[in-house]
Amino acid sequence: SEALAKELGVKVKLQATPWDGILAALESKRLDAVVNQVTISDERKKKYDFSKPYTVSGIQALTLAKNVDTIKTAADLAGKKVGVGLGTNYEQWLKDNQPKAIIKTYNDDPTKFQDLRIGRIDAILIDRLAALEYAKKAKDTAAAGDAFSRQEAGIALRKGEPELLEAVNKALDKLRADGTLKKLSEKYFNADVTQ
């Protein structure tokens, strides 16, 4: 967000906002943009404008390492207790793709991860990059199988601000062309996740 703001010639003011209220904060004009790995979906595009994608990832199941072989596909989630963030695309994806899963929603990540590690839930659905990063730190967990779907994240903006959308896209194009996006990606994710 800081590189983007610099490119746009504006001052950035980072504002910590709970995920389940972040898009509402955009709608109510408490935020001008959401730069927080917001997955671009058809449903969200009805309400918000999105920049060109700046990261690409996927929906990943995170399990205890000892259970990693129990989940390879979405079909394997049937009958399992699966933790997801309340109001996230992971919750919606699970409802749409595996209605036989037992969905447990969470308002915060620490409780969700704790419930996985103590066995209250069988898996968590999160971003593949986050799953790999978490499993690196918590050796008793592992990313199970391949990512379930490709996800592109963009900067969410209010509808009806075409000049801002165009400026953001031009800034992202420049940051991609000069290698800044790739460098930031490798710094934070240890991989180029910009394509």
Go through the PLM ranges and name each one.
Residues 1-7, 67, 81, 86-88, ...:
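Extended ligand-binding regions for polar small-molecule ligands
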Residues 21, 36-47, 94-96, 117-149:
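A ligand-binding cleft/hinge motif common to bilobed small-molecule-binding domains
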Residues 16-21, 29-30, 81, 89, ...:
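Conserved functional loop/turn residues at catalytic and ligand-binding sites
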Residues 2, 6, 11-76, 147:
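Acidic, polar ligand-binding/catalytic clefts
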Residues 13-24, 69, 104-114, 118, ...:
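Short helix-initiation/N-cap motifs at beta->coil->alpha
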Residues 11-15, 33, 60-62, 81-83, ...:
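Soluble periplasmic/extracytoplasmic beta-strand elements of cell-envelope proteins
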Residues 1-6, 60-114, 123, 128-132, ...:
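Bilobed "Venus flytrap"/periplasmic-binding protein-like clamshell domains
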Residues 56-63, 128, 132-173, 189-195:
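Periplasmic-binding protein-like
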